[in-house]
Amino acid sequence: MKAVSYLIVVLGSSAAMALLFVWGGFFNISAREPHWSATTWLMGMVRDRSIAVHSNYIELVQVDGSKSLAVGLEHFHDMCRLCHGAPGYPQSEFAKGLYPNPPELASKSVQTRTDVEIYWIIDNGLKMTGMPAFGATHDKNAILGMMAVLRKLPSLSADEYHSMLDAAGLDKKTQNNSHGATNGDESHSPLIDQKGHHP
């Protein structure tokens, strides 16, 4: 009986301390204040496990790489490069103030993810990171195109990236957002199939 009473006291005290911590505003939500190392580790584990589990419902179909690149380049250049940069294009100034800082897409930490994980991240976004869910505004072909560009980044020089932009007739400077985002019926897309439900 004493053990039960002790457990109740401990749990009650812990809950009260947690409530005080939250209500008292002791946690600094500022993007200029880095997470504690334990928080970073925990959030990283939660993120990686969530991506791995939820992306398991996706089955990608082999597509024409050149076609996907053509579809994705405009979307990538207008949007993705602003936060992540691109060959010959550093991160935009505003992106340097994001926390966590958007990763370099040619980096090993990004490129070692599976295709279905990359697709899921682009499609669904990531909470509390500034990474938007492009699936809300872009169809599957566009998402696959952005993924195709991302996969090609490690082998691209700045000159090669500029040549791709020129060949596609794209302005090398920042463009406006009217770049042809599509959000129509995607159920008949020939480029991707789904296994089970898509969360």
Predicted regions and their residues:
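Short, functional N-terminal and low-complexity linear motifs
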Residues: 38-44, 84-90, 111-116
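Extracytoplasmic electron-transfer domains, predominantly the class I c-type cytochrome c fold
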Residues: 97-155, 199
